[in-house]
């Protein structure tokens, strides 16, 4: 099974991806996480350091694929999750999508691409150009990370449009949304009324999740010394269980940009009225 994780930049994709990868491993699956971001920090919380990238390794070998060994590019992370960082071209030059293609090509050359039960692509930002939409070509499911805000849902809608386009020629489906760092889901619910799709989980704003990123650890690893975090791990295990059940998924029908803008902005301009219970007149007497 191959998964692609997308979402607005800074929404917590890498932190979420790493914890989902560990959750899948806890369910007995052999997992490979591939970071598809020039920052090459997707797997930081799994390995605790910035691992060398595929592109760095290929450049050092003058792009002689036959001189590259699995141990040159695949690093073992926490929980037995294997990690790869695609890397990227220099800033302002080249195509990141090309790098993703080279990464898949190399892993196939190493006979590593088919050795895993689950491969998870963690893809940068919300700019789903043809290049960075490349992981969708290899994926069975797309997961979109969002919060309860306007910008993240607007980005989610653009990603949904990319999934719909890729699904024309690939067996790709949208598994659903994952709400992250949000105490509410009212705007998410408003969006999925207009654009029907599953919501796999909504994670509240938990400071320990943010801290885990800074520490270079997954929540699962932190829970080994802080048992109170086991309840947080359950969120990710729930997501893993839903994915492993191979959901039917959807081919989303994204909303037109202007329609979505009106829908989401109207939610803020004309918020739903709070319903309050009627107060008996005698209760007002002092």
UniProtKB/Swiss-Prot annotation:
Top-rank taxon: Bacteria
UniProt catalytic activity: chlorophyllide a + oxidized 2[4Fe-4S]-[ferredoxin] + 2 ADP + 2 phosphate = protochlorophyllide a + reduced 2[4Fe-4S]-[ferredoxin] + 2 ATP + 2 H2O
Coiled-coil zones: none
UniProt xrefs under Gene3D superfamilies: P-loop containing nucleotide triphosphate hydrolases (3.40.50.300)
Biological process terms in GO annotation: light-independent chlorophyll biosynthetic process; photosynthesis, dark reaction
Similarity comment: family membership: Belongs to the NifH/BchL/ChlL family.
Quaternary structure annotation from Swiss-Prot or TrEMBL: Homodimer. Protochlorophyllide reductase is composed of three subunits; ChlL, ChlN and ChlB.
Gene Ontology molecular-function annotations: 4 iron, 4 sulfur cluster binding; ATP binding; metal ion binding; oxidoreductase activity, acting on iron-sulfur proteins as donors; oxidoreductase activity, acting on the CH-CH group of donors, iron-sulfur protein as acceptor
Protein name: Light-independent protochlorophyllide reductase iron-sulfur ATP-binding protein
Residues binding Mg(2+): 14
Residues involved in [4Fe-4S] cluster binding: 95, 129
Entry keyword annotation includes Magnesium: yes
UniProt cofactor(s): [4Fe-4S] cluster
Keywords: 4Fe-4S, ATP-binding, Chlorophyll biosynthesis, Iron, Iron-sulfur, Magnesium, Metal-binding, Nucleotide-binding, Oxidoreductase, Photosynthesis
Gene name of the encoded protein: chlL
Enzyme class: oxidoreductase
Pfam families linked to this entry: Fer4_NifH
Positions of transmembrane segments: none
Positions annotated to bind ATP: 10-15, 39, 180-181
Purpose: Component of the dark-operative protochlorophyllide reductase (DPOR) that uses Mg-ATP and reduced ferredoxin to reduce ring D of protochlorophyllide (Pchlide) to form chlorophyllide a (Chlide). This reaction is light-independent. The L component serves as a unique electron donor to the NB-component of the complex, and binds Mg-ATP.
Catalytic activity, EC: 1.3.7.7
Cofactor info, note text: Binds 1 [4Fe-4S] cluster per dimer.
Keyword Zinc-finger: no
Classification via InterPro entries: NifH/chlL_CS, NifH/frxC, P-loop_NTPase, Protochlorophyllide_ATP-bd
Pathway assigned to this chain's UniProt record: Porphyrin-containing compound metabolism; chlorophyll biosynthesis (light-independent)
């Amino acid at each position: 099974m191959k998964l692609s994780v997308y979402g607005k930049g800074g929404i917590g994709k890498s932190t979420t991806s790493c914890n989902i990868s560990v959750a899948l491993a806890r369910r007995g699956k052999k997992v490979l996480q591939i970071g598809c971001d020039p920052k090459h920090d997707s797997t930081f919380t799994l390995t605790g350091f910035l691992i060398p990238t595929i592109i760095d390794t290929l450049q050092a070998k003058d792009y002689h694929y036959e001189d590259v060994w699995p141990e040159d590019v695949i690093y073992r992370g926490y929980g037995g999750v294997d990690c790869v960082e695609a890397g990227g071209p220099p800033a302002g030059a080249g195509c990141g999508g090309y790098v993703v293609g080279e990464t898949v090509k190399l892993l196939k050359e190493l006979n590593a691409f088919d050795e895993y039960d689950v491969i998870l692509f963690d893809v940068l930002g919300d700019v789903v150009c043809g290049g960075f939409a490349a992981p969708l070509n290899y994926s069975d499911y797309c997961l979109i990370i969002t919060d309860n805000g306007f910008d993240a849902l607007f980005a989610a809608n653009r990603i949904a449009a990319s999934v719909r386009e890729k699904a024309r020629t690939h067996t790709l489906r949208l598994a659903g949304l994952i709400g992250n760092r949000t105490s509410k889901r009212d705007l998410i619910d408003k969006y999925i009324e207009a654009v029907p799709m599953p919501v796999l989980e909504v994670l509240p704003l938990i400071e320990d999740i943010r801290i885990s990123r800074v520490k270079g650890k997954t929540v699962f690893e932190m829970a080994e010394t802080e048992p109170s975090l086991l309840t947080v791990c359950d969120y990710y295990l729930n997501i893993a269980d839903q994915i492993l059940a191979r959901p039917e998924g959807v081919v989303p029908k994204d909303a037109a940009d202007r329609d979505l803008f009106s829908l989401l902005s109207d939610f803020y301009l004309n918020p739903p009225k709070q319903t309050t219970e009627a107060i008996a007149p005698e209760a007002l007497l002092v």
